[in-house]
Design a protein with these regions (language model features):
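A general structural signal for well-ordered secondary-structure junctions
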Residues: 69, 97-98, 116, 120, ...
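Short, surface-exposed acidic
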Residues: 71-73, 226-229, 276-282
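N-terminal Rossmann-like or analogous alpha/beta NTP/dinucleotide-binding catalytic cores
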Residues: 1-115, 206-224
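Short, structured secondary-structure boundary patches
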Residues: 58-66, 92-96, 116-126, 248-254, ...
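Active-site cores that bind ATP or allylic diphosphates and position pyrophosphate for catalysis
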Residues: 105-245, 251-256, 305-315
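Non-catalytic terminal extensions that flank enzyme cores
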Residues: 1-16, 34, 39, 134-136, ...
Length: 315
């Protein structure tokens, strides 16, 4: 079995790519290139109701503008439905999933009220069902999703954030892997995709740390080898909240339209990760020799209007 390093960039066309996305992509790309590995690109467009027309093409153009190249063809999730269906069938056969007819309001009313910022934990209302019960529900015309049975919560060592342990039984509980609309949920799709694409290292934002134990359970249930994970801090505004419209227009398309050079933005992001002494123009490929995951600050990078003005963007 090959031990070659393979990383990935996985933009979602549910909206435009912004400076925060660019920083995470840069770290992921450098991690793979500095390790002598390859980089794959996947368009995560499985959440079709939220997809913005033209956003996928724009995301790829933004990656090229940043100087982040990739290997092989671009993978698009909406062309891979048979792979996800096969994975679901495997989970059914080993009784790791069950049909769930609960609506969001059902769950909210049945579950104990979470503390601020916490996820509602599924109370297990439909957990008594087996995969074979789906046929009767279909005959009765009852819509249902498929939930994965959470029996334990695997700990993992994050390449950046260190040891992680999340008790899924009290932080979400049994989770959806297939939506009632007939499409795979994020957790199942990314596991199937990363395994099929040969991804060995996933570098992404630390807001996705809670997703990792769920994905590790899926890897185990499907008999797949999981990649290594590195979750890096996000980019936030001056108020400490993750980038949004309230912080002004931080879309890469807006920076490009304003005449910002890609080297200027890459230099700013490289400086924010500790690879440069000051935010000076530099190409992404010139940072490969300077890349060190451990130099990235543990706290989120605060993007201010002053920093944007310094690279020629008034917002």
């Amino acid at each position: 079995m090959s031990t070659a390093l393979t990383g990935r960039l996985a933009p979602s066309p549910t909206g435009a790519q912004h400076v925060g996305n660019a920083r995470t992509y840069l770290v992921a790309w450098l991690a793979a290139r500095a390790g002598g590995g390859t980089v794959r690109v996947r368009i995560e467009d499985i959440d079709s109701p939220r997809i913005k027309p033209g956003a996928a093409e724009q995301a790829l153009d933004d990656l090229r503008w940043l100087g982040l190249d990739w290997d092989g063809e671009v993978v698009t999730q909406t062309t891979r439905l048979p792979l996800y269906e096969a994975a679901l069938e495997t989970l059914k056969q080993v009784e790791q999933v069950y049909p769930c007819t609960c609506t969001r309001s059902d769950i909210a009313s049945a579950a104990s009220a979470p503390h601020a910022g916490e996820e509602v934990t599924y109370p297990g209302t439909c957990a008594h069902r087996s995969a074979m019960d789906a046929g009767a529900l279909q005959r009765d015309g009852k819509p249902f999703a498929w939930r994965f049975r959470v029996a334990d919560s695997p700990a993992f060592t994050d390449l950046f954030a260190g040891e992680q342990q999340i008790d899924l039984r009290h932080a979400g509980g049994d989770f959806v892997v297939w939506k009632s609309a007939g499409t795979p949920a994020y957790q199942l799709a990314v596991v199937v995709d990363d395994a099929a694409m040969g991804v060995t290292e996933v570098v992404r934002g630390d807001d996705l740390i809670p997703s990792t134990p769920r994905q590790l359970l899926l890897y185990r249930a499907l008999g797949l080898a999981p990649p290594a994970f590195a979750h890096v801090p996000l980019v936030v505004g001056a108020d400490g909240r993750r980038l949004a419209k309230r912080h002004g227009d931080t879309r890469l398309a807006a920076l490009r339209s304003a005449g910002v050079k890609p080297e200027a933005l890459v230099g700013l992001l490289g400086w924010s990760c500790g690879w440069l002494d000051r935010p000076e123009p530099v190409r992404a490929c010139d940072l490969i020799a300077r890349f060190r995951l451990e130099t990235i600050p543990k706290r989120p990078f605060v993007l201010t209007a002053e920093l944007l003005r310094a690279i020629g963007y008034a917002g």
